[in-house]
């Protein structure tokens, strides 16, 4: 099945993934990252890490909580076109113009563009709910869309 949304004859087999499914996918990803990162920072900094007022407690904090998640997300996007959360909902990231796999440059740009989406009161994330193609600002800046196959459920009921 081709991922090409504009030229492939099966482009109608895909739908844009909306706000709430993407929130669910993000929650799955957040829990997975928390399960990995929280024990690591606790191992390095001890339980006092969780009561500190410091934004960043040291180089290991940056590596574990900022760099490791960025690398993990970009690697998943590169090889699977989705994080585990998006995989769980059957979604994947594709180039907005061709429907094909996005370039590594697009994916890195998409990750960095999340900060643009998040900083102004999460407005760029909420934008997904109102955009006709269900693109957040990070998708628009990177030239990507999130899609999944239509008719994901069981066969229709027949009598």
Predicted features and spans:
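Short, small/hydrophobic-residue-rich motifs at membrane-helix boundaries and re-entrant hairpins
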Residues: 1-122, 136, 140-143, 147-159
């Amino acid at each position: 099945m081709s991922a090409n949304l504009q030229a492939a004859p099966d482009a109608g087999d895909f739908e844009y993934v909306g706000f709430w499914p993407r929130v669910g996918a993000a929650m799955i990803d957040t829990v997975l990252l928390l399960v990995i990162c929280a024990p690591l920072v606790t191992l390095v900094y001890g339980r006092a890490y969780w009561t500190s007022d410091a934004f960043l407690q040291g180089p290991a904090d940056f590596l574990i909580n900022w760099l490791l998640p960025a690398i993990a997300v970009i690697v998943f996007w590169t090889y699977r076109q989705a994080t585990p959360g998006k995989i769980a909902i059957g979604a994947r990231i594709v180039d907005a113009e061709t429907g094909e796999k996005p370039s590594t440059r697009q994916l890195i740009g998409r990750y960095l563009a999340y900060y643009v989406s998040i900083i102004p009161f999460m407005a760029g994330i909420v934008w997904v709910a109102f955009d006709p193609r269900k693109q957040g600002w990070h998708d628009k800046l990177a030239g990507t869309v999130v899609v999944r196959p239509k008719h994901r459920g069981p066969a229709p009921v027949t009598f």
